[in-house]
From Swiss-Prot:
Annotated function: Diterpene cyclases that can form multiple diterpene products.
Listed name of the protein: Diterpene cyclase DtcycA
Residues annotated as binding Mg(2+): N234, S238, E242
Keywords: Lyase, Magnesium, Metal-binding
Gene3D superfamilies listed in its UniProt record: Farnesyl Diphosphate Synthase
Primary gene name: dtcycA
Keyword check for Transmembrane: no
């Protein structure tokens, strides 16, 4: 029940373009229940307070919206659900590191052991690991069993990149200078797991895209654009979440660390103007993805067509997940419906501005059009 002393925050998000239908996987309850069992087994729900934090991640519902196709293998969906429960916790811990005086030594040591477990789970005796690292061992072993060596290698590479990007983000915000949106965006493309999600989507998709197609610049541009749409959704909804948290007495660091807040601090404008700018970036990126997708369809293999269909579902499902997930409506796990989001979903067609790159580090995506 919502704390009566807390007035719900009304947070309006500008119109967001999404031409894809919404759906949810029929096994959503199973994914959630088994995911919570996984986290409980590995010691993350030892107290009621811990259990509330984990449950609030809502990973089962997120995965069910990302991948609604009932034909997707449930064991793969479950592995991704368990992965999200654990790694959302790790992702949230970066803010504690940013606000501490310990620097990067702790995260580097933690990430190094994680990477070794992901790379060679069979080289470690599970019974000799603590519960936390047993969870990593479990995920790494299941991933290797459930997919091809090629897909597993792609996943490991992306996990490595995600860890390195988290270290870069921690270092960026631990510096004393004012962080600029232009610095933050290229790092956030990786830390929000956009590139990791490219390979997670490939893991879920039963077909394996041939290497020459997979590594083509146009396919990578389309995949990165699709997942960056999810990045912008995250930044828009996280802006509301962070605004609510900063209004609480327990808020730590009040420096902006979200794309919306960074743009607002950089321009001196209003929150509404910064939200509108990020929403426009997002909508233009949707349009870029659609244009690249249309061009790829002409020569795509059946496996690539299946993968593009997965991307469509993730774009739509991610928007729905943010609009419904307790992770965003209940920021601390103790105040259900603390934030009342009012998003506007539209299927209106793209504007001409959609063909203009939005930032130099990702301009190469637009360069793949008509190539």
């Amino acid at each position: 029940m919502t704390d009566p002393a807390v007035t719900p925050l009304a947070f309006s998000i500008p119109q967001l373009y999404c031409p894809f239908p919404t759906a949810i996987h029929p096994e959503v309850d199973t994914l959630t229940r088994a995911g919570m069992d996984f986290m409980t087994h590995h010691g993350f729900c030892n107290t009621e307070a811990d259990r509330l934090v984990v449950a609030n991640i809502d990973a089962g519902a997120i995965v069910a919206r990302w991948y609604p196709n009932p034909d997707f293998p449930v064991d793969r969906l479950q592995m991704v659900t368990d992965f999200l429960y654990l790694y959302f916790l790790i992702d949230d811990l970066r803010f504690e590191v940013i606000n501490s005086d310990t620097g990067l030594a702790g995260p580097i040591a933690l990430f190094a052991q994680h990477l070794d477990l992901w790379e060679y789970p069979q080289a470690h005796r599970r019974e000799e690991l603590d519960l936390f690292h047993q969870a990593i061992h479990d995920l790494a072993s299941r991933m290797a069993e459930l997919t091809t060596p090629t897909k597993a290698a792609r996943m490991r590479r992306s996990i490595n990149g995600w860890f390195l990007a988290l270290l870069r983000e921690i270092a960026l915000f631990n510096d004393d200078h004012a962080v600029m949106a232009e610095e933050y965006l290229p790092i956030r493309v990786v830390t929000v797991a956009s590139r990791l999600m490219i390979d997670v989507n490939g893991f879920i998709c039963p077909a394996e895209v041939p290497g020459d197609e997979w590594y083509s610049l146009k396919v990578q541009a389309a995949a990165e654009a699709a997942m960056s749409v999810c990045l912008y959704d995250n930044e828009l909804y996280s802006a509301g979440k962070e605004q609510w948290l900063k209004s609480r007495a327990t808020a730590h660091d009040r420096r902006p660390r979200n794309l919306v807040a960074l743009i607002q601090a950089q321009t001196g404008g209003s929150t509404e103007h910064a939200l509108q700018e990020v929403a426009e970036y997002r909508n233009r990126t949707v349009c870029l993805y659609l244009n690249l997708r249309s061009q790829l369809e002409k020569t795509a293999s059946p496996a690539l067509l299946a993968y593009l269909s997965v991307l469509d579902g993730v774009i739509s499902g991610n928007l729905d997940a943010h609009a419904t997930s307790s992770r965003y409506h209940n920021p601390d796990g103790h105040h259900p419906h603390a934030i009342a989001f009012t998003p506007l979903r539209t299927t209106d067609e793209c504007s001409a501005r959609a063909h203009t790159p939005i930032a130099p580090p990702i301009a190469w995506w637009w360069e793949q059009l008509d190539q």
